[in-house]
A protein has these predicted regions:
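Proteins enriched for Cys/Gly/acidic motifs involved in redox and nucleic-acid/cofactor modification
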Residues: 1-187, 206, 248, 269-277
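Conserved SAM/AdoMet-binding glycine-rich loop
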Residues: 42, 51-52, 171-294
Length: 294
């Protein structure tokens, strides 16, 4: 199969959705409708796919709906919608059609060896930056958040798999690696920080160890969705040393102790003390956050 640059050139469309907040749900529903109008053949996947009734009440003509990280299931539906032309002499080997080739980062031997189920298949960002997912899911039970229901509990990738992916991206021209997960600070907790191989070395699945290795690759390393765990201080020290970008995306969400308690979130005072300490270690630190007003 080939990735098409527009609806006009596509035989089917896969819509990757978000079901986290109402505007994202509406945007996803709108995108599904737009794709249906353009091609008539639409497969819906992603977070909103975990709530199929929400999709079917607005768009009952979608071809299929899957949940998050359902790559094999999505591809099964693609094959049903668009059977591949088979060559008589090569059996099940697909015949390549002329046209545009996607920019593909196929799972390599190292990914398979580490059981890496999150290895990307198609890179959709511009060449100069890329998102690198290090884990999927979340172990927290915040009162307001639907993520654990949509994404499940945290599953961390092996450090070796993450580093091999990052290495290939940088070798291919990527200048900035954006590290993402639902809870980046908790990376490796679920696998007890197990070690895996990267270029002949054993590396722990731990945020500090991962940051050290990523910082040696010659690209900007930007950390997203970092919560103020104690070990993040070590990561801030790496920032002060110029190893990774002095940037943290920290979702603090509110300043009221009463509201935070109702949200089942840590207290504001403790978080502010942590941030002050980070700034003492790395004065050039830039922090991005989101807050509820009211």
């Amino acid at each position: 199969y080939e990735v098409a640059p527009s609806y006009e050139d596509a035989d089917a469309v896969i819509v990757n959705t978000c079901g986290f907040i109402t505007p994202a749900v509406e945007e996803s529903i709108s995108a599904i409708g737009e794709a249906l109008d353009a091609t008539g053949k639409v497969i819906v996947t992603g977070c909103l796919g975990e709530r199929p009734e929400k999709i079917m009440e607005r768009h009952p003509k979608v071809a299929a709906i899957t949940g998050s990280e359902a790559v094999d299931e999505v591809m099964g539906h693609v094959r049903e919608l668009l059977p591949i032309e088979m060559d008589t002499f090569t059996g099940n080997l697909p015949v390549a059609a002329p046209g545009m080739r996607p920019q593909v980062d196929r799972p390599q031997r190292e990914d398979v060896a580490h059981g890496d189920v999150f290895a990307p298949t198609v890179k959709l960002t511009p060449r100069h930056y890329a998102y690198v997912k290090i884990a999927e899911g979340c172990n927290h039970t915040c009162a307001f958040c639907i993520i654990p229901k949509l994404r499940g509990l945290q599953v961390s990738r092996d450090a070796g798999a993450v580093l091999y992916e990052a290495f290939r991206l940088v070798a291919g021209g990527t200048k900035e690696l954006m590290i993402i997960s639902q809870d980046t600070s908790a990376y490796g907790v679920d696998v007890r920080y197990r070690e895996s191989e990267f270029q002949g070395e054993q590396v722990r699945a731990h945020l500090t160890d991962l940051a050290v290795k990523l910082g040696e690759m010659g690209a900007w390393v930007r950390l997203h969705y970092v919560y103020p765990y104690p070990h993040v201080e070590k990561v801030v020290e790496l920032m002060a040393q110029g190893k990774i970008l002095p940037y943290l995306d920290v979702p603090l969400q509110h300043a009221s102790p009463t509201i935070l308690k109702a949200m089942r979130r840590p207290g504001a005072g403790r978080q502010l003390d942590t941030i002050r300490r980070w700034r003492e270690i790395c004065p050039q630190l830039v922090e991005r956050s989101t807050f509820i007003v009211g």
